[in-house]
Amino acid sequence: MGDQKFQRKKYSTPRHPWEKDRIDAERQLLIKYGLKNKRELWRAQTILTNFRTQARTLQAKLRYNDPLAIKQFQLLIGKLSRLNLLGENATLDDVLSLNIEDILERRLETLVYKKNLALTMKQARQFITHGHIKVNDRVVTIPSFMVEKSMEDSITYNETSPFTDENHPLRMEMSGTKEEENE
């Protein structure tokens, strides 16, 4: 009953396919965040666009003190604060000032790398897809999983993963690189 008849695209492509500046900026983001292809970047851009569109619509409705718009504003800010994109007392201008990097920073792939569970972004992606990472006691195999603020501290290795052993060669290598960075 709730099944979709057709799957829809979850992203929109750029209006002009061959803009050099946009292509270069996208390439830098792909490298920085270890994305597999531009489709993942466009999906994050679409998520950001949807948040911004909703904020602009609410901004227009709030001028007329619409009670439903006030409730929708609270829900939007609540969602963005759960994702740790904004604070609890954020405004619509804060929503409009979000950028693509804010969205990409909340991906599981990025947070695994930032928590030093992997040496590189590509390795973080591989750990996730191979089932070595768990969030809230559940194995997550989706690198683009958006991690909420409450889940962030529970990102660890899976118990069945060989990386839980502190004496694993890769873990020893990671602790060695941490010590070198601290010096």
Curated annotation (Swiss-Prot):
Which spans are transmembrane here?
none
Record-annotated S4 RNA-binding domain positions? 106-168
Q: This protein's superkingdom?
A: Archaea
Q: Which InterPro entries match?
A: Ribosomal_uS4, Ribosomal_uS4_arc, Ribosomal_uS4_CS, Ribosomal_uS4_euk/arc, Ribosomal_uS4_N, S4_RNA-bd, S4_RNA-bd_sf
Q: Where is this region: Disordered?
A: 158-183
Biased amino acid composition, Basic and acidic residues = 165-183
The protein's matches in Gene3D superfamilies, at most eight in alphabetical order, are given as:
RNA-binding S4 domain (3.10.290.10)
Function according to Swiss-Prot or TrEMBL: One of the primary rRNA binding proteins, it binds directly to 16S rRNA where it nucleates assembly of the body of the 30S subunit. With S5 and S12 plays an important role in translational accuracy.
- What is this protein called in UniProt? Small ribosomal subunit protein uS4
Organism annotation = Picrophilus torridus (strain ATCC 700027 / DSM 9790 / JCM 10055 / NBRC 100828 / KAW 2/3)
Q: What phylogenetic lineage does the species belong to? A: Archaea, Methanobacteriati, Thermoplasmatota, Thermoplasmata, Thermoplasmatales
